[in-house]
């Protein structure tokens, strides 16, 4: 029988008094508060980095987050009786941010600002992306190669003709974007972010924000 990972709670010294299926996870009411069980679907190294970042956010005291828990063996992921691998996170009562509610959006913006203040880690080169200027220049080179190929191709289908006609305007926009970024303070901002260990987070949508007691968490 598929237990949605409920069996892993015993590895955390927890017992569920009640459960509820929620979006992509199992919500459990335990003697240590609400916990969320979800399937483990990322590389172990990334999970460790996620854990460290969440610890930094939690320790900052600026906001609460769905902190991943280590099991009694010290691991972040646990295999369940159904053969699946799961993670267990802290969870909190609250409601999702309503995008049509201006007060909710103000609270969400405040939470985002606190997240940016708290989300810092020592820089690891393997997680450091190329700059937007470099990325833009790289894409411009790719557009030139495609345009040159299509220009030399004698027989073109309808799609290739349309693509060739579009290449020029797209390249013009790309070159303008690269030039404007070079002339801006982007590189200084990026250098400062590197020095501070600022972390680029993923999607920040209403589904990822819980509001409780008038505060966005």
PLM regions with names:
Residues 197, 202-207:
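Residue immediately N-terminal to the catalytic "proton-acceptor" Asp
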Residues 33-126:
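ATP-binding pocket architecture of kinase catalytic cores
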Residues 23-26, 72-76, 187-190:
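Short, solvent-exposed loop/turn elements at beta->coil junctions and helix N-caps
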Residues 199, 210-217:
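Active-site Asp-x-Gly
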Residues 2-32, 71:
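ATP-binding glycine-rich phosphate-binding loop
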Residues 1-5, 16, 54, 58-60, ...:
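Gram-positive cell-envelope targeting signals
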Residues 41, 126-199:
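ATP-dependent phospho-/nucleotidyl transfer catalytic cores
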């Amino acid at each position: 029988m598929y237990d949605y990972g409920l069996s892993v709670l015993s590895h955390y010294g927890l017992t569920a008094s009640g459960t509820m299926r929620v979006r992509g996870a199992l919500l459990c009411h335990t003697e240590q508060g609400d916990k969320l069980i979800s399937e483990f679907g990322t590389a172990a190294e990334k999970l460790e980095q996620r854990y460290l970042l969440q610890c930094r956010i939690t320790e900052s005291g600026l906001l609460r987050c769905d902190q991943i828990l280590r099991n009694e063996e010290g691991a972040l992921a646990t295999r369940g009786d159904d053969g699946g691998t799961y993670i267990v996170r802290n969870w909190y009562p609250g409601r999702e941010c309503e995008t049509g509610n201006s007060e909710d959006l103000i609270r969400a913006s405040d939470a985002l600002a606190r997240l940016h203040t708290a989300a810092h880690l020592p820089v690891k080169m393997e997680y450091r992306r190329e700059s937007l200027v470099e990325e833009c220049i790289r894409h411009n080179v790719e557009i030139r190669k495609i345009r040159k190929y299509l220009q030399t191709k004698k027989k073109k289908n309808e799609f290739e003709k349309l693509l060739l006609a579009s290449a020029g305007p797209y390249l013009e926009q790309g070159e303008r974007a690269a030039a404007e970024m070079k002339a801006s303070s982007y590189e200084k901002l990026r250098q400062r972010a590197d020095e501070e260990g600022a972390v680029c987070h993923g999607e920040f949508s209403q589904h990822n924000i819980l509001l409780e007691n008038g505060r966005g968490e």
